[in-house]
Regions:
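Acidic, surface-exposed loops and disordered segments
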Residues: 1-115
Length: 115
């Protein structure tokens, strides 16, 4: 197995869900790289329909957290205090929008792990 293949498989094997975050802001350069990874995700018929929005403002992050918690029927922060929330918006009229957004999010999770 070549080095790139080995590194990719290792990345997939070692990625974990995180539920404890530092309060430090994410450097813009890293955030841009993670968002860029989302744009390389596969999508139905190559439409690249998901729109990715990084919410870095503490004020808006808190508002979105409260709205999502209410939808989930809880008062706990569904983002576990992460300093950035990435929203993947997709038009339900355009193909399998949930799957397209999910692929973009997975690419971003792998990129964040790699960085």
């Amino acid at each position: 197995m070549d080095t790139a293949s080995h590194e990719m498989l290792n990345l997939l094997k070692t990625r974990r869900s995180v539920r404890a975050y530092k309060a430090d802001p994410v450097p813009e350069e890293l955030l841009d790289q993670v968002l860029e990874a989302g744009t390389y995700a596969p999508s139905a018929m190559g439409r690249q329909s998901p729109i990715l929005i990084a919410v870095t403002s503490p004020k808006y992050r808190e508002q979105i957290s409260k709205l999502n918690a209410a939808v989930m029927g809880t008062d706990k922060d569904p983002y576990y205090g992460a300093p950035v929330i990435v929203l993947a918006l997709a038009d339900p009229a355009i193909g399998p929008w949930v799957e397209d957004a999910s692929c973009a999010l997975e690419n971003m999770m792998l990129a964040a792990h790699a960085l």
